[in-house]
Every structure is written in C-alpha cells, then in structure tokens.
C-alpha cells in the first residue's frame, strides 16, 4: 500500500473478483426439517454467521427426501427425547437406519444425537464416534459410510 505505483482501485477490483470466485466454488449446503420453527431458527443462525451464504433450508421430512446430488455428505441431528417420546425413539432410529441403508448408499452420514441408547438402534456401524456437548446435553457425533450390500461384499 506504500508502493510507488500502488493503485487502490485496481486492488479493490482484484479483491472483489477474488471473493466472487471463492463464493462460486462453495458447496451448496441444504438443510431440511419438518418443523417450521427449526427452519426459521436455522436460517436466522446461518444468516447471522454467514450473511452471503450458499445455504438452502427448506421444509421436508427426512423420510421423503431423496439424495439431491450424487454421493452427498449427510448430517443428521434427529430429535432426542425432546420432540419424540422416549418409548418411540428406538423405533424412530431404526427407521432412520433403514432409510439411510436403502436410499443413501454412496453417501457419508454423520449423525449427532443425545440419545445414546437409541443411536445403537440405527443398525449401521459407525467408523468414528466423537463425544460432544450440545449445550448441557452430552451427545455423540458418529460417522457412518453408506454403501450397497454388506461390509463383507465391499471388501471382497
């Protein structure tokens, strides 16, 4: 900036062009929920942190959702004992596991849950488990690669 031939207008133009190119290369982040309150809260939080973002948050039930792109990364934060009664959680998590296995093969699934017992009912083996806290609630973030068939078939 203290260079003899410094051109401030050119510098600003280069910065703006660079920022445009960076934003064009950003992945699209899609969020879905079937509770309007969660959609509004998500949009508000995202816009507060990233005003010029590439996020699309819409109303849709996970069980009606098809992969929007080939081999996506899927991040789930299913309800844990807050929106669903405890006795129904195990069945709900089994349904999540079935949907992941049959609809999302080729994807990488990450699931954040505070219901550690129900998480076992997904029926798919995680390759990574990370202990986190969602506020005061102890949670696990598990990574489950999804593929067709069984793990034995994958490595034959």
What residue spans do the PLM features occupy?
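C-terminal catalytic and target-recognition region of SAM-dependent MTase-like enzymes
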Residues: 61-64, 68-156
């Amino acid at each position: 900036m203290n260079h003899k031939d410094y051109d401030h207008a050119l510098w600003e133009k280069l910065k703006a062009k660079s920022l445009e190119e960076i934003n064009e290369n950003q992945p699209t982040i899609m969020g879905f929920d079937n509770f309007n309150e969660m959609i509004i809260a998500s949009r508000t939080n995202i816009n507060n942190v990233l005003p010029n973002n590439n996020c699309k948050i819409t109303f849709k039930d996970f069980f009606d959702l098809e992969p929007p792109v080939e081999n996506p990364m899927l991040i789930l934060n299913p309800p844990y004992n807050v929106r669903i009664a405890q006795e129904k959680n195990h069945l709900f998590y089994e349904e999540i596991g079935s949907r992941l296995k049959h609809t999302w093969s080729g994807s990488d699934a990450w699931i954040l849950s505070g219901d550690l017992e129900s998480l076992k009912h997904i029926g798919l083996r995680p390759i990574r488990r990370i202990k986190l806290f969602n506020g005061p609630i102890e949670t696990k973030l598990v990574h489950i690669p999804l593929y067709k068939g069984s793990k034995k078939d994958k490595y034959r």
